[in-house]
């Protein structure tokens, strides 16, 4: 007969196992077809891919020469798995945080124009930092592809009257996260 403590330990271990398995439902094994300029390094493989839906947030600012322009402040998007479950969030940094608490930040390494002019560019991002242990702990590269929307407002709408105002531009994209092959 098992005592209560042993039963609870088994239950907790089973719950942890189920939690770990549930994070695997977004796992991908194949690299997406992308232009050479934004291909992840050959020694990396896809760990997970997610769909982003949210906004690119722009702010109207004046440059040193007095010209006004909309500049990117931050993305703000939910990350979903292939079943539509929210599994993380994309925010300023840029940063991507997974539901297990792990987070990766990065810096754009390469870009290509999106196939449609009203969409933000496709990117290859190099990881610059990590926090927490989990899905994003060992990510080294991130691709942003299949973008739709997200471009800033027309430049003519940024002027003295709009200085420091924000504008959100809806967008969707697919993000592929890469880590070194085992």
Range-by-range predicted roles:
Residues 29-56, 64-182:
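Primary mode marks residue(s) on the alpha4-beta5-alpha5 output face of response regulator receiver
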Residues 11-22:
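Bacterial N-terminal signal peptides
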Residues 24-28:
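Sec/Tat signal peptide C-region and signal peptidase I cleavage site
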Residues 2-12:
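Bacterial N-terminal signal peptides that target proteins for export
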